[in-house]
Amino acid sequence: MMKGGMGNLMKQAQEMQEKMQKIQEEIAETEVTGEAGAGMIKVTMNGRHDVSRVNVDPSVMEEDKELLEDLLAAAVNDAVRKVEETSRGRMEEATEGMNLPPGFKMPF
């Protein structure tokens, strides 16, 4: 490989790293809302998995404590799944056309 080719390759790698870092920052700021019990429990979290809001329909509080706990856990899990799906989708968009093997993890 010629010297210029290696320099170009390094430049492309640096540009990709900067692009991926920007996308990761955008994902961290993205908010998703997980739901359970047909929307009776809603949990909002960001891409860093920080929960910012929990909304509980008043009718759920009239039910038993165990049901409320189960619905809260389900809503949090739903929000986590949505964060992961959003992250995966954004990363796939960013690496589209790079011919990476399936499941390849970027080192940054």
UniProtKB/Swiss-Prot annotation:
Residues 84-108 are annotated as: Disordered. InterPro entries: YbaB-like_sf, YbaB/EbfC. GO terms for cellular component: bacterial nucleoid; cytosol. Pfam families: YbaB_DNA_bd. Keywords: Cytoplasm, DNA-binding. It comes from the Bacteria. The keyword DNA-binding applies. It is found in: Cytoplasm, Nucleoid. Signal peptide: none annotated. Residues 84-93 have a biased composition (Basic and acidic residues). GO terms for molecular function: DNA binding. Binds to DNA and alters its conformation. May be involved in regulation of gene expression, nucleoid organization and DNA protection. Homodimer. Belongs to the YbaB/EbfC family. This is Nucleoid-associated protein Csal_1459. It comes from Chromohalobacter salexigens (strain ATCC BAA-138 / DSM 3043 / CIP 106854 / NCIMB 13768 / 1H11).
